[in-house]
Amino acid sequence: MNSNLRKKVTLAGLLVSIGIVYGDIGTSPLYVMKAIVNENGGIAHVSREYIVGSISLILWTITLLTTVKYVLIALKATNHGEGGIFSLYALVRKKAKWLVIPALVGGAALLADGTLTPAVTVTTAIEGLKNMKFGNDIPVPNQNSVIMITIVILLFLFSIQRMGTSIIGKTFGPIMLVWFTFLGLTGIMNLSHDWSLLEALNPLLAVKILFSPANKVGVLILGAVFLATTGAEALYSDVGHVGKGNIMGSWPYVFICLALNYLGQGVWILENPNYHAGATDFNPFFEALPSQWKFFAIILATLAAIIASQALITGSFTLVSEASGLKFLPRMKIIYPSTEQGQLFIPSINKMLCAATIGIVFLFRTSEHMEAAYGLAITVTMLMTTVLLFEYLSLRKVNLSLRLVFLLLFGAIETMFLISSLAKFLHGGYVTVIIAAFIGAIMYIWYFGNKIRDKREAENAYVRLDEFTTMLSNLSHDESIPLYATNLVYMAKVKYNKFIKRDMLYSILDKRPKRAHAYWFVTVNVTNEPFTAEYAVNTYGTKNVINVQLYLGFKQQQKVNVYLRQIVHDLIKDGTIESQPQEYTTTPGRDVGDFSFVIVNDVISPQTQLRSYEKFLVEARVWLQNLSSNPASWFGLDYADTVIERVPLILGNQRRQHITRIAPKKFEDIKKKLQAEGELKE
């Protein structure tokens, strides 16, 4: 979406926001009331008090968590227009070091939840086809058929990610607008049979049902109720695509349609107490519709489920990209399938999401079992977001009393939801917990492994680059040494614009002198601003030793090869460096020479002296680095002349062992002794 639509509240912006932002929360009516009925033992065991109280819980949960916390408060906590837990962390990370923990935990849980959402939404939609007659045939006679159709849809969905979503994305808005309108109209249709159910708007009934004997599971009902607001975190994450104004403008319509549908389903349940009595495999969302509407509803629900899944998949790509930029995750190969900002595709993440989602479908088989596991991870994310928002409010100088009210209110509500959702652990919630723990462990190892490495590196690991400029200039003009490259580029972190790792200069000067017309030391700095693309240079008074500081936003693609060619051209044009005319070229008048890029990779040295815990983290971090994408891909150097050199990483106090030469006479004595013992032959 272009920047104008993000900034302004327009009809187009409102429509796009409906298509992009509300997919997850908009498909919740497919399974929330079903889960609530099943919590109490089936439709034969629910009373009016239970249904009215449950709907009241749903409506006030959406009001407090989605409307108040996310729409009215969180949307103001944007980082240059971008939202989500990592953008929020980037805003507050300077306040306290410990804030990295809620960011890591919340981000890992959000990514884990992403494996379950496509599975549960698509499966629920397709289950509406089960046992439906088309003439004399029943195309989907059993759950196995549902599973196969679901798998085909999911495989298709994941397979088209590489192509980008710019074209199909344009249809999301109209389809979701039809979907929400359909939810509202069908809700009114059923609600018109019993307007008295509007008493569910009374918040006292929401509190009362938690302790009522009509509710057989007590506060554990919140585990099912929470499913109605799982999409609130996605709403915050997607603010960068459409702008907070368009979300605030479209949310009232979406909320009204959702509320009407939940109320309508409640009326139908109370009107049909003996419908499939004792059964738990029916869905009140579809059953509440006239029979002639069901096929249309299933098609529309399937499209809505696909859109919700698509939004979540692309959201996962964005989340991983941001995590990499903040050094929470290893660098991965990122593909930008369109020219639109924010359109990205991460092949490795796509494969893992696809495998996990399909695995979940095969593991749980029915939407009922998936619902039992759904929501546990996202409660953790919401709780972590509350902690970070509390710090953000402090950053904004909000009154301490108001901040404490915010923390205690939403912290208490979300803690209750978390406790109730823990009951789902043994019913499948363990799957997302395991996935979240796995992702969280990778993030922890990568982040703190980097921290330990930076902190414990030997003091002599860095040298002043400006002290070697004369030597590098002399090497550049020494024609007795073969020319290695016109431009020799090292992807090297230059600290404070002057300190560089000794390994870089060792590679140029000591291993085998590498002569080049210009030596480039490029540092990529990831900024808090999402789309920064700037650079600064320092030549140290020379024409051939250049320190380049690239400043790229955490959402910006790192095409170093492209950027550097532009920088060289700029510096030649303003006379900062000498022209590099090419005698042999397909481009007449070309004044920029060839490039050779060098990337130095670390290998743990046996001389490293660290505590066992620190050594484990650093070794695990190096292992993850070797498993992840080639660093050349990360820097956009796939098609450039790139050399990767391995150097020993020495951390902490160095353990130096001295070897002593044996005196000739002593060596002869040892030799004779070994010969006498038969261990050494003449």
Swiss-Prot record:
Reaction equations catalysed: K(+)(in) + H(+)(in) = K(+)(out) + H(+)(out)
Swiss-Prot/TrEMBL keywords: Cell membrane, Ion transport, Membrane, Potassium, Potassium transport, Symport, Transmembrane, Transmembrane helix, Transport
UniProt entry tagged with the keyword Glycoprotein: no
Compartments, record wording: Cell membrane
One term of GO molecular function: potassium ion transmembrane transporter activity
Keyword Membrane on entry: yes
Membrane topology category: Multi-pass membrane protein
Pfam families, alphabetized: K_trans, K_trans_C
Transmembrane segments: 13-33, 55-75, 98-118, 138-158, 171-191, 217-237, 250-270, 295-315, 344-364, 375-395, 405-425, 428-448
InterPro entries: K+_transporter, K_trans_C, K_trans_N, Kup
One GO cellular component term noted in the UniProt record for this chain: plasma membrane
Annotated PANTHER family: K+ POTASSIUM TRANSPORTER (PTHR30540:SF83), OSMOTIC STRESS POTASSIUM TRANSPORTER (PTHR30540)
Family according to the record: Belongs to the HAK/KUP transporter (TC 2.A.72) family.
Reported function: Transport of potassium into the cell. Likely operates as a K(+):H(+) symporter.
Name of the molecule in the record: Probable potassium transport system protein Kup
